[in-house]
């Protein structure tokens, strides 16, 4: 998508571009947020109080009784709707557990013969959050195997997998070296990996030994998992998967993605300016005065990072989603040049290339 070196990144880009546009379920089996509009309708409390001006006390009492009845009816209706929805959800869960026709043998066999060490990553070929975890595993040099679940076979509903991730979504990770500890939610997995690496080696690779920096890394990581990924996911959903074409929804989520990128762009631009002013001392005065554009600095293409002066999970968490954002009509090279350079630096890393290829 964004490499000037020819086929290297254009090839690996295909690893994430196989988004299975025809599979409407693929957007609901990753750990991104999905808005449930079933509960968006609130109770209408605007009662008709015209009878309150009537001087007849009986009419006033009748009006109050009628209003009370309406409120009670509305509350009952909403309560019944919620109960019905919960019952439907329970029945769906039961139906999944009763699906005797679904072949779970591959998943069942794995859990019967689990490895004694390393990691097992459960992912999907179309799940950016799964590739996010693979990138960090690769960067840290951890030995891992990936099981790409087949959603069409319902493998994510296999009881053994649900025991790993009760949300029945990907990614999920098993740490075999910690008595087959299971971790789910991509952000939680990344934090587990960097903290374990730090504990085992004393090297805060992709992390930090400074509490202030750790807090900033967490902030950006949570920003990515709660704002960046879900908004791109929703924009993709309403553009490609939704049963109806709702232009306002596509526009709303695409605009929100642009807002999110604006936040990242500003942070990276501030770090770029600080870097150039620190390293390019002979031209710093000209940059400050505005007589020479900062873009002319030989340090203008040097990598900058969200936290501190090194790559962390705060940066890497964005990579797989940045690699598919053009599918919603956003050209980060033109609209967000610092985000583009930042992403390009990360996508050229051997561990990232390996992970995005699914190796």
Curated annotation (Swiss-Prot):
It holds the Pfam family GST_C. Residues 39-82 are annotated as: Disordered. InterPro entries: Glutathione-S-Trfase_C-like (IPR010987), Glutathione-S-Trfase_C_sf (IPR036282), Glutathione_S-Trfase (IPR040079), Glutathione_S-Trfase_N (IPR004045), GST_C (IPR004046), Thioredoxin-like_sf (IPR036249), Ure2 (IPR017298). GO terms for molecular function: transcription corepressor activity. Residues 117-201 form the GST N-terminal domain. Gene3D superfamilies: 1.20.1050.10, Glutaredoxin. Residues 210-359 form the GST C-terminal domain. Residues 44-81 have a biased composition (Low complexity). GO terms for biological process: nitrate assimilation; regulation of nitrogen utilization. Keywords: Nitrate assimilation. Homodimer. Belongs to the GST superfamily. Plays an important role in the cellular response to the nitrogen source. URE2 gene plays a major part in the repression of GLN1 and GDH2 genes by glutamine, and is required for the inactivation of glutamine synthetase. URE2 gene product may catalytically inactivate GLN3 in response to an increase in the intracellular concentration of glutamine. This is Protein URE2.
